[in-house]
Amino acid sequence: MKTLFLGVTLGLAAALSFTLEEEDITGTWYVKAMVVDKDFPEDRRPRKVSPVKVTALGGGKLEATFTFMREDRCIQKKILMRKTEEPGKYSAYGGRKLMYLQELPRRDHYIFYCKDQHHGGLLHMGKLVGRNSDTNREALEEFKKLVQRKGLSEEDIFTPLQTGSCVPEH
């Protein structure tokens, strides 16, 4: 009986911690800094970005929605992320993309880090995001440390212009 109670209690604690994690990450996030591989074409790097909206769909799934302009057209992108067994790790597009969501000591900041198997190669991209668009030096320093740990160059960090969301034509 004690074993059953312990199992149920641990399961409930795990479920509650997952719910808290989902609540922490949902909402609107402003992109403060980005980094991509050196191989990523300069002309394809996003210079203007909209806020990212993260929604919890239940069952360990999150949806990230954002918009961007391409050839004078507003494009809306939705990415369905499925939680993996590793805390903070999600997969998308049938496992082709792996995303790591890391909360920073400043609770209002996260690092979204993505590995994308694209055209036979592996692309790495990182975003420092916050609940508001204000600059935070501590969060930026943490982002720089992650960039170095992942083997990316601090010189490749750039700050895109924060824009409002555009409205796609349907």
Swiss-Prot record:
Membrane spanning stretches: none
| Example GO molecular function | small molecule binding
| Tissue/organ expression | Strongly expressed in genital sphere organs such as the prostate and mammary glands.
Leader peptide range in chain numbering? 1-15
| CDD domains attached to this UniProt entry | lipocalin_1_3_4_13-like (cd19414)
Main location, first listed in the record: secreted
Instruction: List locations, semicolon-separated.
Output: Secreted
List the Gene3D superfamilies hit by this protein, alphabetically: 2.40.128.20
Whether Secreted counts among this entry's keywords is: yes
Official protein name in the record: Odorant-binding protein 2b
Q: Which organism is it from?
A: Homo sapiens
